[in-house]
Amino acid sequence: MKEKRLYVAYGSNLNLYQMKFRCPTAKLIGTGIVKDHELQFKGRSDCAFATIAPSEGGAVPVAVWELKESDEKSLDRYEGFPSHYFKQEIPVEMNNGKTISGMVYIMNLRQSFGVPSKGYVQTVSEGYRNCRLDMSVLKDAIRQSVSRYADLISDRLINSIGFEQISLFDFDTADVDLDEDSSEADEDEYFDFLGEDEEITDSFIPTQ
C-alpha cells in the first residue's frame, strides 16, 4: 500500500468545502509559509489561476494536507497535471515551528499573467478565511498580477504599432485649414460628450 503524501495548497484548495468535495479522505495537517516565493495569477487573460514562483524575501501562506493515493489522483485531474501544472517537493515552515517537505502543484512556466475571475477569487478568499491566513497577501498578488498583465498588453500593443517620429517640416501649413472657431466648437462638443462629472476608471481587479 502506498504511503500517504503531504500536499501544499496555496490557492483554491485552501477552501475546505472544495477539498472535501475533491478529496473526501484528505486530512488538514496545519498551516505555514513557503519562503522565498510569491503568489501569482497566470493563465488565460480573463481566467487566470493561482501559482507560485521563486521570489527572494517573499512568503506564501499555505495549508498542508495529508492525501491518500486516491486523493492525489483526483487532484491531478482537477489541476490538469501534467499539461497545465507540474509537481515538485517544497519545504514549508509550519506555524508550530517545524519544517516539513510536501508536494506542490506549480503552473507550467509558458503561461503569462492574467486576471482571475470573480468566482475564482471568492473561492480562494474563502479558503484564506477557512485557514485564517493573511488576506493582504492574496490582495497584493491580485494587484501585482493584474498590473503585470496590463504592462504585457501595453508592450504588445506598442510593439505592434511601431511608432514613427514625424517632423513638423513634413507638413505644408498652406494645405491645412486652420479654422479657430471650428476647433473651439469641436473641443466644446468633446467635453460636452464626456460630461463634467463623468469619472473614468481603469481597474481590472475583480470585486469580491
Label for each model-derived stretch:
Residues 1-207:
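Glycine-aromatic micro-motifs
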